[in-house]
Design a protein with these regions (language model features):
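Gly/Pro-enriched, hydrophobic low-complexity segments
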Residues: 119-197
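N-terminal leader/targeting segments and the immediate start of mature chains
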Residues: 24-59, 67, 178, 187-197
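An acidic-aromatic
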Residues: 61-110, 169-171
């Protein structure tokens, strides 16, 4: 009889462990689904940002469209970066120059993987606490490894910071002042060189 009680006790212990594991797993998956829904609802929104690295601090506004992201740097230099899944443009307003680039060959591709994703199972590296949600992605381009972290406030879910690490270099983009905008047109996200004559 004593042997049977010990056996039942062990079984109950394992059932509790399995229940806790799966409920935590489901809760985590539920939060990731909410983050992905939030990301998909970023269309027609903007946020102010402060970007910093070991050498400088820059300020600006980031705009999220349905298929493109536009980043306007306002201080100390006036720059614009517009990216889509396949291409991007870097515009230096002081020099009145534009450079085009392939986003598939840059870490910008990670932004579209995170912001346009609907499948929580494709976001494997997530850390969840009471106050924060971190999504970590890694991409290798031309033998350089980029580690990108998206940090969200947990309740309510709001994107607060993006950290990009490349070897020993890193920069952080702190986001605040989020706004819903009525409509951002295709023209607003145009990649046509504004200084073409």
């Amino acid at each position: 009889m004593l042997e049977k009680d010990r056996f039942l006790e062990k079984i109950n212990f394992f059932i509790v462990i399995i229940f806790v594991f799966f409920s935590t797993e489901l809760n985590g998956e539920n939060i990731v689904s909410k983050v992905l829904k939030y990301n998909n609802n970023l269309h027609n929104t903007s946020a102010l940002f402060i970007q910093s690295n070991s050498e400088s601090v820059e300020e600006g506004v980031i705009y999220f469209g349905k298929e493109r992201i536009k980043i306007n740097y306002l201080k100390p230099r006036k720059l614009t970066i517009i990216i889509s899944e396949k291409k991007g443009v870097y515009i230096d307003h002081d020099l009145q120059e534009s450079q085009y680039f392939n986003t598939n060959k840059s870490y910008a591709s990670v932004f579209f993987k995170i912001f346009n994703n609907n499948n929580p199972l494709e976001i494997p590296n997530v850390n969840i606490s009471d106050s924060l949600i971190e999504i970590n992605e890694e991409v290798e381009i031309d033998e350089t490894v980029y580690k990108i972290t998206f940090i969200y406030e947990n309740n309510p879910i709001i994107l607060r910071k993006i950290i990009i690490n490349e070897n020993k270099e890193s920069f952080e983009l702190g986001l605040f002042g989020h706004e819903n905008l009525k409509s951002l047109t295709k023209k607003f996200f145009s990649m046509v060189d504004p200084y073409l004559n």
